[in-house]
Amino acid sequence: MWEGLWIATAVIAALVVIAALTLGLVLYRRRRISLSPRPERGVVDRSGGYTASSGITFSQTPTTQPAERIDTSGLPAVGDDATVPRDAPKRTIADVHLPEFEPEPQAPEVPEADAIAPPEGRLERLRGRLARSQNALGRGLLGLIGGGDLDEDSWQDVEDTLLVADLGPAATASVVSQLRSRLASGNVRTEADARAVLRDVLINELQPGMDRSIRALPHAGHPSVLLVVGVNGTGKTTTVGKLARVLVADGRRVVLGAADTFRAAAADQLQTWAARVGAAVVRGPEGADPASVAFDAVDKGIAAGADVVLIDTAGRLHTKVGLMDELDKVKRVVTRRASVDEVLLVLDATIGQNGLAQARVFAEVVDISGAVLTKLDGTAKGGIVFRVQQELGVPVKLVGLGEGPDDLAPFEPAAFVDALLG
């Protein structure tokens, strides 16, 4: 019995000694002081190898507005019952003001031009309005050459009749020479024969083979450019508007240049025509440089892909050298942007000899390519057409027959002569 007790005591004592040794060793290690310096902790490179020269740019994060917080008072929170307690105050119903519906603004209405009157109707009006010319030219000549053989006094009467009708010396001499040759053949026996001969001679004098087309077709890189010149009071601006109406009706995109900057009424008139026919218009302040406005009009025509640019120039007297030089400047400046295809001279058919003096000066300055005779319905003569072509060497391309939008007609020699003879 005692032997077992001693063994148990020895085992317990051994365990106590082992535990004491272990505890002492742990305490010893914790209290040991190291005399070597502790290594410094380095900064860990987390750049991924990118440097300032690696092409990456840095930008500031855009500031975002915080989302508007919703008022959750009275609403169940997380963990609350799904139903509102009976003792909770009831939420009132409030009227919420909603913004009124605003309809989208309608696009401005594009004015639609009235349908162009057919050319046949215009030629009939030409015949009727030139009826007064028969006394001076048509009936007078028919009465002379339809009576049979003519002596020298009769031929002098024929010549005087032509001069009174404003044909001018050159055209008169040419017509008399042709009539003498045709009547000398002896084939003219009746008044109808005389009328047929006179008709052929007058048509031939108007040179029906001349090109009377308006050069208004666009080029590959820019629109065609038409310059309209003339003195004040000839209907120049009205002619530009009427021509624009015809071009727009033909499907052309037209830009009007209001280069008549000396009269505000001229630019306003052209603006009205543009709105009426559906064309664009370029204008400057009153007194602006006409050449600059003309240049801007061509520039806009090119940018907008227009087909035609019509430039209305300031009316000027042919005796004013400074104003004529300015007209030359307008053409030169426009030519820097695009070539000028047509220079139309607008003449008043009622002014006779003075109109030819104007035409000669304009032809020398801007090299006109065609003439437009306005107010042809107001003349009792009509011979100015022959004289313009004879002395200027350019065709009469258009004739104005009144103030109506369709009273601008293409000039056709045969129809004009028929209107003269009735």
Curated annotation (Swiss-Prot):
GO process annotations (BP): protein targeting; SRP-dependent cotranslational protein targeting to membrane
GO cellular component: cytoplasm; peptidoglycan-based cell wall; plasma membrane
Catalytic activity, reaction form: GTP + H2O = GDP + phosphate + H(+)
Disordered: annotated segments: 39-86
Disruption phenotype: Depletion of ffh (SRP) and ftsY results in differential expression of 14 proteins.
Alphabetized UniProt keyword annotations: Cell membrane, Cytoplasm, GTP-binding, Hydrolase, Membrane, Nucleotide-binding, Receptor
Subunit relationships: Part of the signal recognition particle protein translocation system, which is composed of SRP and FtsY.
Protein name: Signal recognition particle receptor FtsY
UniProt source species: Mycobacterium tuberculosis (strain ATCC 25618 / H37Rv)
